[in-house]
């Protein structure tokens, strides 16, 4: 219901983009009965623009539509180029960048590049190019590791460490996947998707006792959330 509701304001548009990404990433698919909402991001910042293009890329990936995915990559690259012109050598947005809340920053430019690498990895997957997929994912995690953690709504909707971890699991490389999920959890403690990925990696490594401990964390955290919501 929340995804289908939004007023014409920058805050609600930003929230809608975040929620749509969260729905698709956490579930692993987009519900057929739910219509994806198009959002006019012209007055929003690079974070929201990155997230919107990433969401569209996920939908294109699900449909195995490489052409549509490439268009999203091209679109975000254009936004990155425009934003780069508004940040000076010190990494500070110039006056012409608009409202401070949505003005681009040097950090934001780097995080956008992370998202582009993630999208390129998905495109490589569709084309069956495993070496290029891994190259893009490795580059994404390297760059994300150089960035600060977002205390509020995440700039990077699908942490590249988790995306890489999920891909490594699919390649039957659980030990390497575990490293990526642990990296994601190092600054996103109790993130459900990362914990589930960690469980899958541990079980693939026959480390069942450790997997049970992680599963207990999910149960405890979920219970705490239910109590808080009452």
Predicted segments with their positions:
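Solenoid-like repeat scaffolds
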Residues: 2-10, 36-46, 76-83, 102-109, ...
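Start-of-helix signal in alpha-solenoid helical-repeat scaffolds, especially tetratricopeptide repeats
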Residues: 14, 48-50, 107-114, 158, ...
């Amino acid at each position: 219901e929340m995804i289908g509701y939004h007023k014409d304001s920058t805050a609600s548009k930003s929230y809608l983009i975040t929620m749509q990404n969260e729905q698709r990433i956490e579930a692993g698919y987009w519900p057929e009965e739910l219509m994806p909402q198009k959002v006019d991001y012209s007055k929003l910042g690079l974070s929201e623009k990155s997230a919107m293009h990433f969401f569209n890329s996920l939908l294109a990936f699900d449909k195995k539509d490489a052409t549509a995915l490439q268009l999203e990559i091209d679109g975000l690259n254009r936004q990155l180029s425009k934003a780069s012109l508004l940040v000076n050598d010190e990494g500070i947005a110039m006056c012409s960048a608009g409202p401070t809340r949505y003005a681009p920053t040097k950090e934001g430019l780097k995080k956008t590049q992370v998202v582009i690498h993630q999208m390129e990895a998905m495109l490589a997957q569709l084309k069956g190019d495993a070496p290029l997929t891994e190259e893009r994912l490795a580059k994404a995690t390297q760059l994300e590791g150089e960035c600060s953690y977002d205390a509020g709504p995440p700039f990077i909707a699908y942490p590249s460490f988790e995306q890489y971890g999920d891909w490594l699991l699919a390649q039957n490389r659980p030990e390497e996947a575990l490293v990526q999920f642990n990296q994601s959890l190092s600054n996103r403690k109790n993130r459900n998707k990362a914990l589930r990925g960690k469980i899958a990696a541990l079980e693939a490594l026959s480390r069942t006792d450790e997997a049970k401990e992680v599963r207990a964390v999910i149960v405890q955290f979920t219970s705490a959330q239910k109590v808080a919501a009452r």
